[in-house]
Amino acid sequence: MDAGARYMRLTGKENWVEVTMDGEKERKREGFTAGQQGKYNPQVSKNIGNRNTNDCFAYKGIFLWRISLTMWILLGINMCVSAEDYITLISDPYGFSPIKNVSGVPVTCVTKEFAKWGCQPLGAYPDPEIEYRNVSQEVVKEVYQENWPWNTYHWPLWQMENVRYWLKENMQENQQRKNNTKEGIEELLAGTIRGRFCVPYPFALLKCTKWCWYTAAINNESGKAGKIKINCTEARAVSCTEDMPLASIQRAYWDEKDRESMAFMNIKACDSNLRCQKRPGGCMEGYPIPVGAEIIPESMKYLRGAKSQYGGIKDKNGELKLPLTLRVWVKLANVSEWVNGTPPDWQDRINGSKGINGTLWGELNSMHHLGFALSQNGKWCNYTGEIKLGQETFQYHYKPNWNCTGNWTQYPVWQVIRNLDMVEHMTGECVQRPQRHNITVGNGTITGNCSTTNWDGCNCSRSGNYLYNSSEGGLLLILCRQNSTLTRILGTNTNWTTMWGIYKNCSGCENATLDNTGEGTLGGVANKNCSLPHKNESNKWTCAPRQRDGKTDSLYIAGGKKFWTRIKAQFSCESNIGQLDGMLHQQILLQKYQVIKVRAYTYGVIEMPENYAKTRIINRKKRELSHKRKKRGVGLVIMLVIMAIVAAAGASLGVANAIQQSYTKAAVQTLANATAAQQDVLEATYAMVQHVAKGVRILEARVARVEAITDRIMLYQELDCWHYHQYCITSTKTEVAKYINWTRFKDNCTWQQWERGLQGYDTNLTILLKESAAMTQLAEEQARRIPEVWESLKDVFDWSGWFSWLKYIPIIVVGLLGCILIRAVICVCQPLVEIYRTLSTPTYQRVTVIMETRADVAGENQDFGDGLEESDNSETSERVTVQKAWSRAWELWQNSPWKEPWKRGLLRLLVLPLTMGIWINGWLGEHHKNKKRKGGLETWHKKGTDIGLGQIPVDHLWCYKKSKSL
């Protein structure tokens, strides 16, 4: 084999040889054409040699590129956000729902000696200071809309009714006592029996721990704040209230244990930029009982009485029969500046009046406290022989064990303020209202932009009560004190022209004016009968006050709709100290609580992205990879084949799973509805049990009464005083009433009413049970449908055929893997076969040898031989042995153009077969060469005989060209 050809095939480089003799130049001069360079044309083209000749890898790369593109498209489609419904146990958005009608909420008290007072033991409910759950500000704002409402709780009313009923039942027995009080009653009446109010699950109490007030619904005509709302910013859920007296009769001051709770009720304004904040007294502080609140509801109207005993807490008629028409503030009184039990400047009041600094005070000389009259300075206390409870007064012997001569100003005291003008956002000060004849026209004394909603833009230069045209239309009454201090602005929509026309129609006022004559401190008109017009009792316009028995009626003025009416209230505020009993004390303290119904969890349907969890796993795996690795195409093909098989086998299973999941979600949702219906049944059953227990307690009380009467009759019979006297005196005591008073169920005190109520509960419970049973049955049916759907789906798709086909999957997989393995082996062995063919195939090359000979002068006829003898002899002497063949094969492997390690490793395996091939080819080539030599000699001799060597300048010979490497 030609080594030069082998080298060119392995390296792609050209290897050619030009053999030229010395006589070539002379031949050119004689016109001979020079010999052309013998340029070698390789058997394999350069274009193919410059690239990979393995077609297998090229086609495989194209195939894998197309599959990768398809997979990326499918992956992009799957990465789109798509949601899937999940039915799960989710938390309620708020966790609770507010209860507006608190009268139907079951409640019990917790205290010591619970059996004695009809309460539960202290451990029955958790301590609210330890067990509570904070509620976020966003949830409280969303539920209550920054409006913490007023609630008239029935629990304090029930307690007051119990004490009231006991007093009436034992009145005759109490009259027989002179110097002692019935055992245990003294503590109850004095409010020393303390406890908590608790509600059972699923109810709870939402306790506000931080709040403030703000104004709403401001009237542009009068400037009044129609509503003052309370914004609770922090709250917590508890089961019980704080510790408070269970009951108490009317009292002036309370225990130190209640100071903190009472101080919390002094609510401050939310806005620090209100005008009242800049005034000396600041803004109003306290709890605002709203307009329209009912202190005693209609269901307990028998407790209202005739006249209100709570001071400023009253309706427009001074009673409690109607809702409140004015806002009432209740706060912990600040008595630090009081002197001898009286407010500041009390000694400067006029003619012994009860009004000072714009406030009309209630009774301060002798305050009622637990049946005693207390002096202002605490130097004396007198027993009145009667106690006040609610709106009633009882003649009851009561001897407390406290020192009534102490200074009561050291203890916490409730102060009630009834605000008539309701302009708390403008000023917290109260004023004395002017009479109508003191209202004049302010000629140049008022400047600025004045209105009922803008007091800061108005200025006055002289004390008085001046009419002024509002910048928004209508009339204003501006009260100016101390020549520059604006204390009040009252307004009306009636303009000056309308008012002046009414004024001129008054009798004797045709030529009168409202100019200030300067009489008195604040001035006034010249003729009192021509004062600012108003409507009298007959709803007719008049300018003169009413005259009776030589006395002139005092006419005052107010803002808004009452600007033209007859007003008798001289002061804008009414205030009193004390005069509250345990019921109202509890009612005020309970306003920091709202009754809620807890619903911690419920069933619901939520939407979650389908690839949510998968995306997180993929992202986590990508982060864990520090280097990108090159994936093998064979592995990807295997993965795609397996995925295709699994997809084909699981396509129908996916359809079945989707349908099954749909029915499952519907079944679970129906089950959730059935659970809610069963919850309603439990609540109705609980209410019915309460009703039954109520009847049992009523029956217990009646049986106890009958037993007491029977006991008394038997006692009379034993004493032999039957029918002889109308009364019987005995030293034997019969203790009765060791039971709880249940008369708060007055509307159901008869058996007929109780049975009607029980029948109503039974009907409601029956309906709820039917609904619950229907919902439960529907849930069971939908749950049973799930396997039926599965069976029907198998029948439609002929699952037996699909599953019988699955048994061929292993054979198919093994066959595919075998084909892939065989193809890979072929692709690896193909270049080895090509290399071996290149190295083992002999290649022949035609070489033209140009030889220039001289003329034979000495001996033409001499025979020097054929010129090949020496060469042939040398050729014959060089035999190809196995060692030479191994050396040549190893040298070829060392000089191979492939430098990559894996290619050189593959070529190393070809050294042994190449050695055998060289040795065999050498042995066969020697035999072939001997045959060619014999034939060449015969031809040479023949040509030499016919033509003659001297006549042939150039001889053409065939020979083997041997490379230096061989």
From Swiss-Prot:
The record marks 632-633 as: Cleavage. Specific enzymatic cleavages in vivo yield mature proteins. Envelope glycoproteins are synthesized as an inactive precursor that is N-glycosylated and processed likely by host cell furin or by a furin-like protease in the Golgi to yield the mature SU and TM proteins. The cleavage site between SU and TM requires the minimal sequence [KR]-X-[KR]-R. Residues 699-715 are annotated as: Immunosuppression. Residues 633-653 are annotated as: Fusion peptide. Residues 823-966 are cytoplasmic. Keywords: Cleavage on pair of basic residues, Coiled coil, Disulfide bond, Glycoprotein, Host cell membrane, Host membrane, Host-virus interaction, Membrane, Signal, Transmembrane, Transmembrane helix, Viral attachment to host cell, Viral envelope protein, Virion, Virus entry into host cell. GO terms for cellular component: host cell plasma membrane; membrane; viral envelope; virion membrane. Residues 665-715, 756-791 form a coiled coil. Residues 84-801 are extracellular. Glycans are attached at residues 101, 134, 179, 220, 231, 334, 351, 357, 382, 403, 407, 438, 443, 449, 459, 469, 483, 495, 505, 511, 529, 536. The chain crosses the membrane at residues 802-822. SUPFAM superfamilies: Virus ectodomain (SSF58069). Residues 1-83 form the signal peptide. One of its GO terms (biological process) is symbiont entry into host cell. Gene3D superfamilies: ATP synthase delta/epsilon subunit, C-terminal domain. The surface protein (SU) attaches the virus to the host cell by binding to its receptor. This interaction triggers the refolding of the transmembrane protein (TM) and is thought to activate its fusogenic potential by unmasking its fusion peptide. Fusion occurs at the host cell plasma membrane. The transmembrane protein (TM) acts as a class I viral fusion protein. Under the current model, the protein has at least 3 conformational states: pre-fusion native state, pre-hairpin intermediate state, and post-fusion hairpin state. During viral and target cell membrane fusion, the coiled coil regions (heptad repeats) assume a trimer-of-hairpins structure, positioning the fusion peptide in close proximity to the C-terminal region of the ectodomain. The formation of this structure appears to drive apposition and subsequent fusion of viral and target cell membranes. The mature envelope protein (Env) consists of a trimer of SU-TM heterodimers attached by noncovalent interactions or by a labile interchain disulfide bond. This is Envelope glycoprotein.
